[in-house]
Amino acid sequence: MRYIFLPLTVIICMIFNFCTGISQKRTLQLYSYIYSNNLHIHQDILSKFSEMATKVKTKLVKKEKKEELNNDLETKLESVKTKKAVKKTPKSLTQTKLDFATPTASPTKWAKIPPLDPKEDVDEAYKKIAELREKSNVYIGAHVSASGGPEYSVPNAYNILGQSFALFLKNQRTWNWKALSKSAIEKFKSNMSSHNYDPKFVLPHASYLINMANPDPDKRNRAFDNFLDDIQRCEQLGIKLYNFHPGSTCGLCEKKEGIKHISDCINKALEMTKGVTIVLENAAGQKNVIGSKFDDLKQIIANVEDKSRVGVCLDTCHLFAAGYDIRTTEQFDQVMKDFDSVVGLKYLRAVHLNDSKSDLGSGLDRHENIGKGKLSEETFRFIVNSPYFKNIPIILETPVTEGNEGVYKQEVKLMYSLLD
């Protein structure tokens, strides 16, 4: 009987192969199954055919969806890799025509440095600014991106004509970080040399998460580990300065206790590192925040054992927001005299150059672009010509928003144009 249905079996298997698209091997397996089990009645054959076809089609649909999903993922991954390749593999790290993200003054906003103006020769423009820097001993730059690694911060700084620069040494908004690679360290140093940057005019900024004034020992220890890691990165890269915000008591302890916690952490970090000066940044006067008054900075420094490795960075926006009026030459000079008498000019290691959106004494940390806030362009004229700010990094942290992506280069040029 089986021989009677042999032609029908073959025809059904051929149709099965054509309709489902399964391999010839599986088709032959089906044929063998029908033949060996002596399925005499065509209803049995068709029933088995239908059952197996349904299972195979289900598997094929799942397979097709899986392949489609994999293709989509591969396409997306390829797109990401392509973008990373553009950023991480320029023709040469020493070339200046790079386009990376650069931070704004706000910790929640970022913007991109635009492609360089093709009409402007960057090397020639940088040379002109460098000549002004040599004559004046004024080192103005900005906080630039280190996206992809610290080695990329150097050409980014060069692109905006910066004579100094700041950067984050790792992701400033996470507690998780990777160690610096040997390659990144070597490339950073190589770029510093090829672009003629002196490490003493590089001012890394600490993570926004660090708060060593916190009375909670677990949180303070976690902050210290982040703090220490940054300083050790400075050691690896050959950077001499490290800037951080003193911190906040969070309303959980007296200011005196918070100051002691900060000083203790600084002392511990100095014992564990070499060659890096820890720079305290003055605060804007926010509630519970330490460092808005010169006396706060004085007390922290007083408790530091190795005073040769501690300093201060004065932020012009923070000064104004904290109640120090610097809008006229006379007022600015008086503020600097007060700083000298309370803290000491010998501790002044850096400046953050920012206008203020907020009023005098507002206690609000709101940076604005130069000459567009409560401080006039004239204010910055006598600031950059001040004898107090010679031979130290002067860093712009003004807002970079959509539509003014080239603001850092413009402001660097503006500041140097204000020199006498």
Residues covered by each model-derived region:
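Active-site beta-loop-alpha junctions enriched in small/polar residues
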Residues: H143-S147, K170-Q172, S207-L209, G247-T249, ...
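Histidine-acidic metal/acid-base catalytic patches
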Residues: T54-K55, K88, P107, P115-K127, ...
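Alpha-helix N-cap and loop-to-helix initiation/capping positions
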Residues: N176-A184, N214-N226, C253-H261, N288-D296, ...
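N-terminal pre-domain/capping segments
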Residues: H40-H42, L46-P204, N214-Q232
